[in-house]
Curated annotation (Swiss-Prot):
This is Ubiquitin-conjugating enzyme E2 22. It catalyses: S-ubiquitinyl-[E1 ubiquitin-activating enzyme]-L-cysteine + [E2 ubiquitin-conjugating enzyme]-L-cysteine = [E1 ubiquitin-activating enzyme]-L-cysteine + S-ubiquitinyl-[E2 ubiquitin-conjugating enzyme]-L-cysteine. GO terms for molecular function: ATP binding; ubiquitin conjugating enzyme activity; ubiquitin-protein transferase activity. PROSITE patterns: UBC_1 (PS00183), UBC_2 (PS50127). The lineage of its organism: Eukaryota, Viridiplantae, Streptophyta, Embryophyta, Tracheophyta. It comes from Arabidopsis thaliana (Mouse-ear cress). It comes from the Eukaryota. Self-ubiquitinated.
Length: 251
């Protein structure tokens, strides 16, 4: 694999300058993906131009720089599968800027812009994908349908998740829960099934004790009532005996 060691120091310095410029001021619809450890592989994400079959697609491509760059042109490849006359099945890009029209003074910005323009205006006369080239010349609607199908399947951008919104929602939920709590009050929440069983068992024990107390109280009341009734009967019988004794004395 090529690396910075395969490029002359002056070329690395120039590439670093160009990549910084591309990062700070990217071309329309192009974002360069920089790998500081390997300037010989320049990757970029290209947005499908509006009004073309590649619209709403995001295509990853790369420029492979040889050890004698910039005296020899880089090789361009689409890493995202695309249906295009000037892109071979292995992703290789055919455009004159990267072949006979190459000039060492051309920078990366120019090359990337040319590749994106190729999505706007293909050149079926120099097709690497013969099917796409023939279809473009004979039946544009069918060509566009195929290109849109490939775009929808292979070049669909990945969704971006708003982590900030999720954090804000979580914070709002926590604030709402805090506001509903009574200051100074502590609510014990069972943390496991064991705790729940303990709480349930405790409640059952308390209810059982309560039932026993009620039953015992009722028993005491009943016993007391019986004792009082028996005492009253004894007193009544004693009165009867005393009355009989008095009657006998009179006789």
């Amino acid at each position: 694999m090529a690396s910075n060691e395969n490029l002359p120091p002056n070329v690395i310095k120039q590439l670093a300058k160009e990549l910084k410029s591309l990062d700070e001021s990217p071309p329309d619809g192009i974002k360069v993906v920089v790998n500081d450890e390997d300037f010989s592989q320049i990757c970029a994400d290209i947005e499908g131009p509006v009004g073309t079959p590649y619209e709403n697609g995001l295509f990853r491509m790369k420029l492979a720089l040889s050890h004698d760059f910039p005296h020899s042109p880089p090789k361009g490849y689409f890493m995202t599968k695309i249906f295009h006359p000037n892109v071979a099945s292995n992703g290789e890009i055919c455009v004159n800027t990267l072949k006979k029209d190459w000039n060492p003074s051309l920078g990366l910005r120019h090359v990337l812009s040319v590749v994106r323009c190729l999505l706007i205006e293909p050149f079926p006369e120099s097709a690497l994908n013969e099917q796409a080239g023939k279809m473009l010349l004979e039946n544009y609607d069918e060509y566009a349908r195929h290109a849109r199908l490939y775009t929808g399947i292979h070049a669909k951008p990945k969704p971006k998740f708003k982590t900030g919104a999720i954090s804000e929602s979580t914070t709002a939920l926590n604030v709402g829960q805090t506001n509903n709590e009574t200051p100074g009050a502590a609510t014990a929440i069972p943390s496991s099934m064991t705790d729940i069983k303990r709480v349930t068992t405790s409640a059952q024990d308390q209810q059982h004790v309560a039932n026993v107390v009620v039953a015992a109280s009722a028993s005491v009341v009943t016993t007391t009532q019986k004792r009082e009734a028996g005492l009253a009967k004894v007193q009544a019988d004693k009165k009867k005996v005393d009355a009989r004794k008095k009657s006998l004395k009179r006789l």
